[in-house]
Every structure is written in C-alpha cells, then in structure tokens.
Amino acid sequence: MNPILINRLQRKLGYTFQQYELLLQALTHRSASSKHNERLEFLGDSILSFVIANALYHRFPKVDEGDMSRMRATLVRGNTLAEIAREFELGECLRLGPGELKSGGFRRESILADTVEALIGGIFLDSDIQTIERLILNWYQTRLDEISPGDKQKDPKTRLQEFLQGRHLPLPTYLVVQVRGEAHDQEFTIHCQVSGFSESVIGTGSSRRKAEQAAAEQALKKLELE
C-alpha cells in the first residue's frame, strides 16, 4: 500500500491505527484476498447503527420511534456512506482484485459504503467504543445538524409513490436491466419508468431493493423533490 495515501486516509479519518493489519484488512475487498473486510463490515454496521440511534435519541427527545427509524435509515444508507467514503478519498486506498479494478470497483457505491463500515469495525477493535463513537459523531456532525423528522425521511420509493398517488398518476414501474458480478457481490441496474418522463431513470445497488431505491431517488431529483 502507498504509505502517502494511507497516512492521508488516517488524517482524514482522525485516527491512526495501532494494529496496521486491521487497517489493511478493512481496505481489502473479497476479490483481492481471502482475508477480506466482510467480518469487519458486519461489526461496523452494528456499531454505526447504535451510535446514530443513540445520537438521534438524545437530539430528538420528543420524536417518535417511526421518525427516528427513518432518520437513522437516511444517515446509514449506502449512498450516505459512499459520500463519506468520497470525502475520505477512500477509493484510492482500496485493495481490489483485478476484475474489480478493471470494472471500476473503486468507484462503486456499494464497495465504498461497505469499506466505511469495515473501517468502523476495525477502529473499534483497535481502540474502544468511546473512540469510534467520537469519530463517527465527528464524521456525521453536519449531517446530524441538518437532519430533521418528517416526510423527507421516508425512503425514496415511498415518497415517489405518495407523490404520484396524490396526483392520481400511475405508479412507477421498476425493471432489472442488468446484474453484474458473482452471487456474493452483485450489482443490480434498475430502470424506473415514471409517468411524464420521456426516458427511464437509472439506479444501481448491491441488491434489487437498493437499486430500486436509488432509481426512485433519481426520479425525485428529476421532479425537484429531493
């Protein structure tokens, strides 16, 4: 690994690993090595969910469980994590196999998002829960300050459906047009057709559901509702 890139990443994270092998594992996709980051990702996913849930619970003492769940989903969803990964310039540090490198895996939202979760798991194992909680809250500070309860926290498919139903328009249709990759690491491409659009909008994701949500989000942006 390029030490300049690794040092830059650790500065952006606000954390220097004591166990360098944990950092390397967190950055390693399963296409590159059998010692990959999926177990760290599993751990990091749970830690992130806890930290964000705890922050929302204390920030919004009068908000009900439904709104808090929707806010948490917005903050921990794949495209939010991919945005954070790009802020860290994480793509340049990924360890990918030849196939993933050739297909542009360092830009794929699902890989970027999974790696952020793996880094969270790695930092926790390298330090303690207080340290990773402090870091996550720092990474999310602006997003936590800007988020608020309400309809905007409903998932994109629900919001698009409610918008169209409110105007007595047909519901959108979602069509899988491509599935790339092996069974354990697929990328779905969905075309979403919305009444009034001359062309379908496109969404991609690591599952059909995530790709449909991404397509719905693009439709909302086209309708200037996002």
From Swiss-Prot:
Protein name: Ribonuclease 3
Gene coding for it: rnc
Organism: Pectobacterium carotovorum subsp. carotovorum (strain PC1)
Catalytic activity, reaction form: Endonucleolytic cleavage to 5'-phosphomonoester
One example GO MF annotation: metal ion binding
Family matches, as Gene3D superfamilies: 3.30.160.20, Ribonuclease III domain
Function: Digests double-stranded RNA. Involved in the processing of primary rRNA transcript to yield the immediate precursors to the large and small rRNAs (23S and 16S). Processes some mRNAs, and tRNAs when they are encoded in the rRNA operon. Processes pre-crRNA and tracrRNA of type II CRISPR loci if present in the organism.
One GO term (biological process): tRNA processing
Cofactor: Mg(2+)
Pfam family name, one: dsrm
Active site per the UniProt annotation: 45, 117
Family of this protein: Belongs to the ribonuclease III family.
Subunit structure: Homodimer.
Domain DRBM: start-end pairs: 155-225
Record localization: Cytoplasm
Domain RNase III: 6-128
Residue numbers binding Mg(2+): 41, 114, 117
